[in-house]
Amino acid sequence: MEEDNMRGMFRAVLCCLAVLIVAPASAAEKLRVTKAVAFAWTFTPLDVGMQMGIFAKHGLEIEASAAAGDAKMQQALTADSTDVGIGSGPGMAFMTKGVPAKAVAVMYGVPKNMAVMVGYNSPAKTVDDLKGLKLGVTTVGSLTDWIGKRINNLKGWQGSTGITTVPIGGMPPARAAIKTNQLDGYIGALEAGYALEEQKEWRVITGAAPFVDHFITHVFFVREETIAKRPEVVRAFLRGWMETIAFMKANKDKTVEITSKVVNIPPSVAARAYDEQMSNFSLDGTFDPKALAVLKQSFVGMGLLKDIPENDVMFTTQFVPVK
């Protein structure tokens, strides 16, 4: 009898061990994250954090994707095709038009990462030469669209006498349109301009930073449903992002190695982007009041909105500062 009891206990122990061996560790939280575009160097911390296991360390399994501009990304948020969107500060205007999401943290300040570019053989040499030109942008209401309208506003150019922004999406259609003279230039990622300068295809006329002193270039958008039901996942993502920024600051060579492959640019261009852009990433996601004021006023001044929107329509501060 005692021997039978011992056998039973032994079998029970084996069963418990089997359960422990087979049972998975606490499953990582899946999070769908969409970049507004695939080719911007400033969005590559997502890839760095994924490749270095930083988001995984925070209990996240990132499902990454990219859209063809801010408006397309906002459509993905509306359609519940993504949980998080990495997009533009001007994109916060979409929140007033029914997109069921809010900005939860600032990602990037003044637009040191953006530029106005023209075809390599264009007669345009200075900002003043942009008057009357057609410049491609990603989508209506995007950061790139905002920059074109901002230059018009500061220069006092109106209507067709100034810059005409043409929504065209990403780099491939823009390059084709400039080659066939359908467009004079493009407003986009500075490093893309540098890369195409090396190929003697485009020239950078100006960066975007001179046209604004205080600004919110990029933010993180999160669906309101995700904010309400999975706030800890949002916090984990933001912590993972900020840890990734710290890693990038401390590891230039590895960052250049990863990011040059992600956005398909030479390492020399990625290194230049690193040197010029790395310092402008937010370290805690806080919304700067001066930058918000400039952004909100511009929505009205440029005809994007009729009235200055309330803060709580566009963003929430419950996740910042990120700690």
Locate the predicted segments by residue.
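Short, glycine-/small- and polar/acidic-enriched structural segments
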Residues: 29-160, 165-170, 177, 184-191, ...
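Solvent-exposed, polar/charged alpha-helical surfaces in well-ordered, non-transmembrane soluble domains
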Residues: 52-53, 75, 79, 102, ...
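Sec/Tat signal peptide C-region and signal peptidase I cleavage site
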Residues: 21-28
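Conserved C-terminal helix/tail region of periplasmic/extracytoplasmic solute-binding proteins
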Residues: 299-323
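Bacterial N-terminal signal peptides
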Residues: 12-21
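Short, Lys/Arg-enriched N-terminal segments with co-localized hydrophobic residues
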Residues: 1-6
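Pocket-lining segment of extracytoplasmic ligand-binding domains
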Residues: 89-92, 172-261
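Secondary-structure end/capping motifs
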Residues: 228-306
